[in-house]
């Protein structure tokens, strides 16, 4: 739920501005990117990783170029997992964190595999959003999770309902 809330609630700019994601992203990231109607307006470019799962500066640059070639527009976000559930590789987030700033991209980090067992430092990574699940190393129950987004970044609501009062206001 938290991944869908963040991925579908962010403003990625005009239609056609793409999203970069690494090839080692968890299905809980890739499935919304490929299937949520709101995200279909923003083509996804998959960034290659080394065999061990590492994302290199060269791969980030190549992914950015590929996205620009395919859409004619700069992508608006980079999504990367801190630690891969497939390879166990822990990304160098300080290296990765500079790339989005240099290229005017939002940086979203999935820390579901690492939160609770490896330090998570959104500030030093310069992350715009950090998303996690509670049922892994945070030892929460299945179905729990959450996210952090930086101050000033807003999410559009995915669900609407009553306020309990002020019914005249829509």
Enumerate the predicted regions with their spans:
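Pyridoxal 5′-phosphate
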Residues: 1-170
